[in-house]
Regions:
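Conserved alpha-helical scaffold segments that buttress catalytic/binding sites
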Residues: 2-328
Length: 328
């Protein structure tokens, strides 16, 4: 299909990021090996794309700020050292154009119809982009933004393959009932839209105290596989996660990481922080395990919120997670 078919939806990476360089000639940063030109797309095996908006978070009454995450993450990721003899090829497609939301204040409420239509258009553009990458044989890394983008990314995978699995590593089910899309509704809308079969859906790290009884019952009744945080910690995080990977077998799968699943000590800069959660090390171990399976097609990381970060702790953790995914 080619990168040209979706360029109207893409905002290229800023020159400031592309020009990142070390003061030490002996450093070999990841930025030196990232492709930004259209021609680089065709030789890449991995494509990175950002979706810098937090409209869905705002609708869900969360803390806004996630729109700033994709470029903040890039700045940390691209300063990490490139391992010697690595053959991985990465193309950075830039960000989905989301200008309509970039400068909206928290109390500046758009007309409901305008807001809904705009967010739907953003999701449509992201679905088209990710679907293009998948059909061109690329593995995809998506940086949010709010967790509502899971609707767009899972839909893209569903449109591309006959059957797929979805892992949502999250403190929340994100199965709220609502007419409009929010960061709390993507998986309900995916199931209702026949883009996701409940028996192929795994919720991991869920905290009962952060989810309504109705939605917990809905997940159970429809056949979703739910792994609650206390059970995961008791069994062992990697042991529990391996059971999911074994169950998925060879089906192409989506790995969605909502950063609020991680304890605030490791990830303070998220849309909904909590002192309870997985550790950063545990999540990196999970990503490493998932990466060993060649059928992992999408890594999506959402709800990083630089506004509330401390010394870039959260964006640095995200960069390490991506680095592990790419380079082990």
């Amino acid at each position: 299909m080619g990168i040209e078919s979706i360029k109207e939806h893409l905002q290229p990476v800023s020159e400031k990021i592309k020009s990142l360089r070390s003061h030490d000639k002996h450093d070999h940063w990841l930025i030196n090996e990232i492709g930004f030109k259209d021609v680089d797309y065709y030789t890449a095996d991995h494509v990175l794309i950002g979706c810098p908006q937090h409209e869905g978070v705002q609708r869900n009454k969360g803390r806004i700020g996630a729109a700033e995450a994709p470029d903040k993450i890039r700045k940390q990721l691209y300063k990490l050292q490139m391992p010697e003899n690595s053959e991985i090829k990465i193309f950075d497609a830039g960000n989905i154009k989301t200008d309509i939301y970039n400068n909206i204040a928290e109390d500046d409420i758009l007309n409901e119809m305008e807001s809904s239509d705009a967010l739907n258009r953003i999701h449509d553009a992201l679905t088209k982009a990710v679907e293009t990458f998948l059909k061109d044989g690329k593995n995809v890394i998506v940086l949010g933004g709010g967790n509502d983008i899971s609707f767009a990314d899972v839909r893209a995978l569903s449109n591309t393959v006959k059957e797929s699995s979805v892992i949502n590593v999250d403190a929340h089910l994100d199965m709220r009932l609502a007419d409009e899309m929010t960061s709390g509704t993507p998986y309900r809308k995916l199931v209702e839209g026949n883009h996701l079969k409940p028996e192929n859906f795994y919720e991991f790290g869920i905290r009962k105290e952060n989810n309504s009884k109705k939605y917990l019952e809905d997940a159970e009744n429809q056949g979703t596989h739910t792994f609650f945080l206390p059970d995961v910690l008791k069994e062992g995080v990697t042991t529990s996660f391996k059971r999911i990977l074994d169950d998925i077998q060879d089906k192409p799968f989506f790995f969605g990481l909502d950063m609020d699943v991680i304890q605030a000590a490791d990830a303070p800069g998220v849309s909904a922080s909590s002192p309870m959660g997985l550790t950063g090390r545990e999540v990196i171990d999970m990503v490493y395990l998932a990466r060993q399976k060649e059928n992992m097609r999408i890594l999506e990381i959402t709800e990083t919120n630089p506004t509330y970060d401390i010394d870039d702790r959260t964006v640095k953790l995200v960069s390490q997670i991506i680095y592990c995914y790419l380079l082990g």
